[in-house]
Each structure stands twice: as structure tokens, then as C-alpha cells.
């Protein structure tokens, strides 16, 4: 029997390497389920947290930064650099598509392009630190 840290080390590394996401209230619950089940992202969903459900955007932005999570939203208000400066965040991803099916497809492409570049085995947990990215249904298509 080995030392606990030796046994758990590989498991911890896999957990740490998972993309860490803060999904705000504008993200549909079905999309959060897709992030968790299919993409294996570690998602904090504000609608599952009673204290955060009605919090203002600034609070979500600050909390995502404190928790070192990439904020994912459908809310274009976050594109205002004066209110939400990109250099102060753990990454901000504003996604846009007409329906949940297309949003899921968009997240699949984002996962491959940003979190698993060059078919890397271990994902990059926060590829957008200090940056904002606005993507729509045409993003990442060959």
C-alpha cells in the first residue's frame, strides 16, 4: 500500500486540469448539463446556488475571478470593457447561437480549439485568462 498522495496524485491532476467554468444565469440548464456530461468541464452554475441567482453581473464577474473560473454567458453586457476589464478576469466567453442544439455544437468546437489544442491529452484549464472571446455559430468551422 502506497502513500495516499502517491495514489491520489494522478486523480488530482486530472481534476485540476479540467476546465473550470462559471456559468451565469443566462446559460440554459441543458447547456450546463452538456458541459458537465459530454465535455467533462467543472461547472459552477449560478442557478444552483440560491445566493447567486439574482446577483448582479458585476458580482458574477468578481466571483468568477476570485474562484479562478472562466465566465461563460450569453449576456453581451459583459463585452463592456469599462465595466468588465478583460485583464482582471480568469477569462470570459460570450456565446451566441439561435438555439440550445447549436450552442452545444459551438461549445464542442470551443472545447476542441481552446481547452484541447493540438489534441493535447490534458486540457488547458483556463486558456482565456485576461481575455474575452465572443463567439457565434460560425466560429471554429473549417
Where are these regions (language model features)?
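Acidic, metal-binding active-site segment of PIN/NYN-like and related structure-specific nucleases
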Residues: 65-83
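A general structural motif
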Residues: 16-18, 68
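Acidic, metal-associated active-site segment
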Residues: 55-69
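Conserved acidic segment of CheY-like receiver
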Residues: 20-22
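Short beta->alpha junction loops
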Residues: 47-53
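Acidic, PIN/NYN-like endoribonuclease modules and their adjacent C-terminal/linker elements
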Residues: 2-15, 24-25, 29-40, 50, ...
